[in-house]
């Protein structure tokens, strides 16, 4: 990578030093674009790809149409646009890629040595469009281009393997469409020849091996010939071991090999998937920005769950080891982005005392990496000149991350610091069960289980009825019922919608919560005078979209002969993304310096929303909090219908909120919340300036508070991630406030009712405070449990009004 970074720096400097009308400029731009494209292929940084497209396009634009080199530049444009299509799925990029690649071929004589390369670009783009739209004509044309590229390339040419691999991919795609066995056989032959022509340490060899393995695996599934299975697994395992290949290619190879062996040899399959899980941090290293990390991890969603399920399915392994190993995989393969930041925010007191220089540099680098890329780069370079382009920012961010790795290596080399900023082991995590068990779910096509962490160790409860297909069906039905339950139309059957909600809560009890609580011995409510037991849910993936804390048969709980069959009537529930995140939250529970302070952010009106997004009960909610909580600081949106005004520092802007967060103990937000449907890092609380400077999940990442104890997010969907590919990452506002340093956070799983939300807030703080305004934030989970349970008793038929609120954290 150092060679590639240096190539890009030299290429950029050459372009900048060359006049715009210089005849060599196009060639220099092309070289720069090629290098940027190569770095994108390795790391997946979109800024590199965008810069590569810009450079290639400019090279083509400044070159006369009859110039012999124009075809090179057009082909580069096509290749880069096709790569961007594969990242974002924008069909216009793909159509433009095909046009540019075809123009390059048409402008090239048949005996030109570069013609094969241009034909290969045409093949890749046409095959991508076939996979998107399904037009067989595109696939046939792609195959023709790939075959011509092979035919005109000498047998000893270094690029011949590329073209052969393309032939194999196109033939495999045609077999999957038409089922002609000859196509599959030819695909395997072409892929095998590509592998044989490639040196064992070449980074492209992993891709060629993967293509061979995929084709052999398809033939095995069709014919059942064991030699095909063995050869497919061998090819994929070898691909995963090519150290010079991109980590994402190696992960896909290992995952595919494990998938082929899952039914026949779950033990070996589990080992292969475990190796792939261990590579995930390299797929999305800290040096990449958040959006690139999310995209790269989203494409590998569910990998840790597959690995854990296969570990549990390996009956040849000792039973007492399987559960612990499975839990370790889920801990290391889920919530990676959160874990990266949490790992570097431990207590530095001893390090500062013994090694102040190292501690200071570690802190500087950590804070740079916690910032959004544009900010961190400016701080890192201390450059007063023009802001760098995004590709340069991305490179500089990686350099900061590389220096952080060196500093971490130095720190871990010191006596007593060997585990500094490393993920906790399963043994480390066992200590987190002292206050109550932690239940980690894994809903998977191979098998579904709950892993129970107690002070005695880790055990598992099989959940055979909790299949992904069934869970997805219930999730869709649940959220549709929630929407129907608040439908304002006169003819809406809201009672029937609430009935569907109750039915799904009962199903969630029968299939998930009840088996877990029974296994843990929580078979009923505690005896009078006894403390309610606590339990932490780490739902992971699909179950994070359903309210485990509200599972149960709520309308039957008082029926004669019926045991208390609800979670609310047996335990106090809390949530955590992982056990490591719970450990992090508990590191922030030391008493803050007295006196406590409270920040109240109230948005009874929201600029830019229809009818100003009126929340009439917010004013009442804020007034109640002012009267009850210690040293309240109120930021509130002024009423535009009256002459009421507010000083600038009293208006709830993001800047005003951030200014106060460093000093407060409790933060309460009564406002609209918005869960972003595709990029959860852009989920936000809608404050006064939400359209200009939103308070998003991403903007909270740099925040690292010392005095914070409780954040109450009285807003819609603040504990919800909507992008299904990122469910394992738990990216939402509730976890963002946990990361910022709040050990207790109250969030919501769906849209909440304004009036009832204010009532829940009032009842919660009534239970949490005394007459002297002393607040026991460590009782937050109990206070919410008692509040919701009481409201449930009043409104058992309308769970949508009381089941959304949850407690997350310590």
PLM-predicted stretches and their roles:
Residues 1-210, 218, 223-225:
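Thr-biased low-complexity repeat/linker tracts and other Thr-enriched repetitive architectures
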Residues 8, 46, 50-53, 91, ...:
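Conserved positions within tetratricopeptide repeat
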Residues 18-27, 44, 63-72, 89, ...:
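Acidic, Ser/Thr-rich low-complexity linear motifs
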Residues 266-568, 573, 579, 584-607, ...:
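Amphipathic alpha-helical protein-protein interaction segments
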Residues 303, 333, 450, 535-537, ...:
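Residue-level detector of buried hydrophobic side-chain packing
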Residues 541-543, 578-674, 713:
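A domain-level signal for caspase-like cysteine endopeptidase catalytic cores
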Residues 573-584, 665-774:
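Catalytic cores of nucleophile-dependent amide-cleaving enzymes
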Residues 757-810:
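An often Trp-containing, charged/polar helix-loop segment at the C-terminal end
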């Amino acid at each position: 990578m150092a060679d590639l970074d240096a190539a890009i720096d030299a290429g950029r400097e050459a372009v900048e030093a060359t006049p715009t009308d210089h005849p060599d400029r196009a060639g220099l731009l092309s070289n720069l674009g090629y290098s940027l494209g190569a770095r994108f292929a390795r790391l997946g940084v979109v800024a590199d790809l965008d810069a590569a497209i810009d450079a290639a396009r400019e090279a083509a634009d400044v070159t006369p149409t009859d110039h012999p080199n124009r075809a090179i530049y057009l082909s580069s444009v096509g290749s880069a646009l096709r790569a961007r299509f594969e990242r974002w799925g924008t069909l216009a990029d793909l159509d433009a890629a095909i046009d540019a690649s075809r123009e390059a071929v048409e402008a090239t004589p048949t005996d030109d040595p570069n013609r094969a390369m241009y034909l290969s670009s045409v093949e890749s783009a046409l095959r991508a469009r076939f996979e998107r739209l399904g037009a067989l004509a595109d696939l046939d044309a792609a195959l023709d281009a790939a075959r011509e590229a092979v035919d005109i390339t000498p047998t000893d040419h270094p690029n011949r393997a590329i073209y052969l691999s393309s032939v194999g991919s196109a033939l495999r795609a045609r077999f999957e469409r038409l089922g002609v066995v000859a196509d599959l056989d030819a695909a395997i032959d072409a892929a095998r020849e590509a592998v044989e022509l490639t040196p064992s340490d070449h980074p492209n060899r992993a891709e060629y091996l993967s293509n061979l393995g995929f084709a052999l695996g398809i033939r095995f599934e069709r014919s059942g010939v064991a030699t095909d299975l063995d050869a497919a697994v061998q090819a994929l395992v070898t691909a995963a071991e090519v150290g010079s290949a991109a980590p994402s290619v190696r992960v896909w190879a290992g995952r595919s090999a494990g998938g082929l062996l899952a039914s026949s040899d779950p033990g070996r399959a589990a080992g292969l998937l475990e190796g792939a899980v261990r590579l995930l941090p390299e797929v999305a290293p800290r040096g990449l920005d958040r959006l690139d990390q999310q995209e790269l991890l989203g494409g590998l969603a569910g990998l840790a769950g597959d690995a854990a399920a296969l570990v549990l399915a390996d009956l040849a392994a000792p039973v007492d080891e399987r559960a612990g190993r499975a839990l370790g995989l889920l801990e290391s393969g889920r919530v990676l982005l959160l874990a990266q930041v949490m790992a570097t925010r431990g207590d530095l007191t001893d390090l500062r005392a013994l090694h102040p220089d190292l501690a200071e540099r570690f802190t500087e680098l950590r804070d740079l990496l916690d910032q959004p890329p544009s900010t961190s780069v400016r701080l890192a370079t201390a450059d007063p000149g023009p802001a760098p382009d995004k590709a340069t920012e991305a490179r500089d961010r990686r350099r900061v991350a590389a220096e952080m790795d060196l500093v971490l290596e130095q720190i871990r080399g010191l006596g007593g610091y060997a585990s500094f900023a490393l993920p906790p082991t399963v043994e480390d995590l066992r200590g987190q069960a002292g206050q109550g068990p932690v239940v980690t779910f894994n809903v998977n096509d191979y098998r579904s289980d709950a892993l129970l962490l107690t002070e005695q160790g880790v055990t598992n409860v099989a959940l055979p009825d909790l299949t992904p297909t069934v869970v997805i069906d219930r999730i869709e039905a649940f959220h549709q019922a929630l929407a129907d339950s608040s439908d304002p139309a006169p003819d809406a059957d809201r009672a029937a919608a609430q009935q569907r909600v109750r039915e799904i809560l009962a199903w969630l009890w029968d299939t998930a919560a009840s088996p877990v609580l029974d296994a843990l011995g929580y078979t009923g409510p505690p005896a009078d005078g006894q403390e309610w037991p606590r339990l932490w849910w780490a739902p992971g993936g699909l179950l994070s979209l359903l309210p485990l804390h509200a599972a149960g048969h709520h309308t039957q709980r008082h029926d004669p002969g019926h045991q208390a069959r609800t979670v609310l009537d047996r335990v106090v529930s809390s949530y955590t993304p992982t056990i490591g995140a719970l450990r992090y939250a508990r590191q922030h529970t030391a008493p803050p310096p007295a006196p406590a302070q409270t920040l109240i952010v109230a948005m009874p009106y929201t600029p830019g929303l229809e009818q100003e997004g009126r929340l009439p009960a917010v004013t009442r909610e804020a007034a109640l909090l002012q009267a009850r909580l210690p040293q309240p600081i109120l930021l509130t949106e002024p009423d535009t219908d009256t002459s009421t005004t507010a000083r600038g520092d009293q208006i709830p802007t993001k800047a005003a909120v951030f200014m106060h967060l460093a000093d407060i103990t409790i933060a309460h937000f009564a406002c609209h919340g918005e869960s972003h449907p595709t990029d959860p890092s852009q989920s936000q609380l809608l404050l006064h300036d939400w359209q200009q400077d939103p308070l998003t999940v991403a903007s909270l990442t740099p925040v690292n508070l010392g005095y914070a104890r409780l954040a109450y997010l009285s807003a819609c969907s603040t504990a919800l991630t909507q992008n299904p590919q990122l469910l394992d990452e738990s990216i939402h506002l509730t976890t963002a406030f946990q990361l910022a340093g709040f050990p207790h956070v109250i969030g919501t799983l769906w849209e909440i009712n304004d009036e009832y939300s204010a009532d829940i807030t009032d009842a919660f703080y009534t239970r949490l405070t005394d007459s002297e305004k002393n607040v026991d934030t460590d009782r937050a989970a109990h206070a919410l449990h008692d509040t919701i349970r009481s409201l449930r008793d009043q409104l058992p038929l309308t769970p949508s009004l009381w089941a959304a609120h949850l407690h997350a954290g310590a």
